[in-house]
Amino acid sequence: MTQAIKEIFKTKIYGIIREDDPEKAYEIANAYKEGGIKVIEINSGIDAIKKIAQIEDIYVAQGGIITSEQAHKGIEAGAKLLVSPILQMGLTKVSSASKIPLILSATTPNEAYSAWKVRVPIIKIFPIKDLGCSTYIEDLLRPMRFLNVMPCGSVKIEHIRPLLNAGACAVGMVRGLYLGKSYDETVKLTKEAVSEAQKA
């Protein structure tokens, strides 16, 4: 298990940034770090990955990967984790060859089980709000408690404890922590999110 994966299990909060501007993404990443999140998924391109990978004690995850070519570019830019928004099995070869862990996404129980079968350490469950939040996680894990699932998609701070108590290993947080917020507000909200996760 790599340090990036260990950190997700420890913090239980996985920070996601969806910003086109690399400078803005860099600012948000620093706010996440100050608030206690060390594993950060970037969906805003290679330039942002390169910049954020330079932040000390931060593990950059490259999000939105569909093709092997995208994965290779992310690794070259400094990504320590590969993340696909779909069940893209072809990426397991890149992950195995590079020894960079891979997170695949699932919506159905069959997809989640298929991801587990190829030894994906964490399975992103997306979009959790539309699937039924904590109730869906409970139902999904009832027959498959061996799955490490991380719900993402419109998750708010008040959803954190119910999702974790339902059996999720971590929760992905996106724009709710930074959209329309100042740097200090993002730090404060991030600290709240991390604190909530530790109470679960």
Please provide the spans of the model-predicted regions:
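Catalytic cores of alpha/beta
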Residues: 67-77, 110-119, 142, 155-171
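A charged, well-structured terminal subsegment
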Residues: 138-143, 187
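Glycine-rich beta-to-alpha transition loops that act as phosphate-gripper elements at the mouths
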Residues: 18-21, 62-68, 84-87, 104-110, ...
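Histidine/lysine/aspartate-rich catalytic loop segments that bind and position anionic ligands
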Residues: 88-131
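Glycine-rich phosphate-binding active-site loops on the catalytic face of alpha/beta enzymes
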Residues: 80-91, 124-133, 166-189
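Short acidic, glycine/proline-enriched helix-loop-strand junctions
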Residues: 57-58, 95-104, 144-152
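Short catalytic-loop micro-motif centered on adjacent basic/acidic residues
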Residues: 38-41, 82-83, 124-125, 150
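Conserved N-terminal beta1-alpha1 strand-loop-helix module at the mouth
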Residues: 1-78, 97, 157-158, 165, ...
